[in-house]
Amino acid sequence: MFKILLVCALVALVAANENPEVKELVNDVQADGFVSKLVLDNGSAASATGDVHGNIDGVFEWVSPEGEHVRVSYKADENGYQPQSDLLPTPPPIPEAILKAIAYIQAHPSKE
């Protein structure tokens, strides 16, 4: 039994690939902005573009330990860092009673 466990541990160690190979690397910095891209052989990748105003658009992605492909796109500008992904939490919907109250208040403004 111990030998089977040892063989399984060795197979898992070899398959872990702690040092992935770089498949593509681009770093292009110009006076009017930059382009950066990194792609690894384990499914991880990151890319970004930026302009002279400090605005950056980018994407980073990887494969989770569960085998799920995770992708996050983002924008960074004067409004801050704004990530978007299906895996990020979202706020709950506004309750119907609150929506009705807001509509009533807008339809009946105060007389002051």
Swiss-Prot record:
One of its GO terms (molecular function) is structural constituent of chitin-based larval cuticle. It comes from the Eukaryota. InterPro entries: CHIT_BIND_RR_consensus (IPR031311), Cuticle_Struct_Prot (IPR050468), Insect_cuticle (IPR000618). Keywords: Cuticle, Signal. Residues 31-92 form the Chitin-binding type R&R domain. Pfam families: Chitin_bind_4. The keyword ATP-binding does not apply. The keyword Signal applies. Residues 1-16 form the signal peptide. GO terms for cellular component: chitin-based extracellular matrix. GO terms for biological process: chitin-based cuticle development. Component of the larval cuticle. This is Larval cuticle protein 4. It comes from Drosophila melanogaster (Fruit fly). The gene is Lcp4.
